[in-house]
Amino acid sequence: MARKSSLPEEVTRYKPCKCARIRNDGGVYRVYKYSAVKLASGEWSSDYGYLIGKIIPGEGFFPNKRYQKELAEQNLKSFPDGITDVAYGKYALLLGITRDLRDKLKACFLPERAAQIYCYALILCVNGFVHIDQVDDFYQESFLSLVYRKYSFKMGYTALSNLLHDLGSRGEPVRMFEQELIDSCSKNVAIDGHVVRSCSLENDLAEPGYKLSLLKAPQVNVLIAYDVKNRIPLMYRTYRGSSVDKKSVEDLLASRSFKDTKFMVDRGFFSDTVLKLMSKDGNCYIIPLTVSNKNVKRIKKTLQCTSGEFVYKTGRKDTARIIYYEEQIDNDVRIIVYKDVDENNSKRKSYQQLMDMGENNYTQENYDKYCDWWGVYFLQTTSKDPAPVVYSDYKGRGSIETYNNYVKNDADFNDLKIQDYYVQHGFDFIMLVTGIIHEKLNEAVKRINKSSVSIFDVLIKAGHMRMVKHEENWQLHNTRTKDLALLEAMGFVPEKTYPL
């Protein structure tokens, strides 16, 4: 006599196959793939196996995505619910202008991992800050999901968390990539520090720092090394929020090999140890001095900028007249004092106007005290270059825009919620790659030589273009002749079709 089922008939009639078993979980009828297993005793039993869907009484069987895929692969049933319209223009543009970056990643990482890193960075560069649990949505709805559909990597939360953890804990490929950037750079390297607010109480690096009163939260400190002439980042490294830059930079410099490099750093990095590190292996440095420096105090007493003068070009048409005083401290170290005459005159005029208007704290006494020192720079250097070159190198450092500074919103790269130590360092590398992509886009925009066109404008215009799925292929939609002409001037011509 057959055993009578305890499940209602309005449920059992929707049983999808013989090898399925239905389980009532508090009124939810889940369906599992049933299989027979032979026990060690020789007797037979059953195994529920994996979940394939659920049954709603009176409605039918609802397969989950795994079972849908299984049925489709067996040509038993098709569930055509895939995305048929993807964002094309922004991603295709960046893919075209960053081919060399993709090749560099492939030289240091396995192909799957290189592609995953590349896609993650592209998504961040195109869309600004995207939380890790939202990246996959952007990926699936982008042209990247077509380009890399034959790859097996995933872009979900777990997959990207594992990626960041591996980048932070298995650092040899990262070291190789960064060292290649350093070896092939212009040898003019700036190092700068950034304070990043950290909202995670479990982050090992997050600590109260010198900006606690401003941030109202712990911070982490990020040091970034840049190639000044090529305007790309070379290294990102996160340090404890309580650490000072002059100590953190010791670790940064020791972690990679720098040879015949000229360092441009700010006064916060001034220490004997750091200066020695920046002077070995044929390296040299340029660093501004603080007003409390003993040599600055001594030189100020009798300063006369009589060593020479030159004209510094500040822009396409703008220039500045610079006079300077130069003094050799020892066999290697010089102090050069520069005075920007035009800047000094401009600030004198501005101050006098504010003083005439009766603004608070703008007094004749303060004017007489400070007017001679406006536009004056005290630089210490071990570079053998002449004074005009040293000044030009130092001023060039100020034109660097980091990707951290480019993104402007409240929940962004300046307000991280990362908890894991390794994930934090893995994200450093993603930010490095994103910063390189950003600068390549910036250079491509500059080449069209239109001051009215910005990166934002280009991404908006390219972002209108879509790839839509048709019966025979994917086809380009939503284009405009004016936008196509602008993008062509950048060297990007969109594909009209893409294979299925």
Task: Annotate each predicted stretch with a short phrase.
Residues 418-442:
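Basic, amphipathic alpha-helical segments enriched in Lys/Arg and hydrophobic/aromatic residues
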Residues 237-258:
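Active-site beta-loop-alpha junctions of metal-dependent nucleic acid enzymes
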Residues 1-190, 194-200, 224-237, 250, ...:
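Dynamic "connector" segments at or just before major functional cores
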Residues 218, 238, 282-399, 464-476, ...:
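An anionic, glycine-rich sequence signature occurring as long contiguous blocks
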Residues 33, 135, 188-196, 231, ...:
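Short, conserved catalytic/metal-binding motifs centered on acidic residues
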Residues 264-273, 291-294, 423:
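Acidic, metal-coordinating catalytic cores used for nucleic-acid/nucleotide bond scission
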Residues 176-240, 341, 345-374, 378:
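Active-site cores of enzymes that catalyze phosphoryl transfer or operate on phosphate-rich substrates
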Residues 387-393, 411-424:
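Short, solvent-exposed helix-loop connector elements
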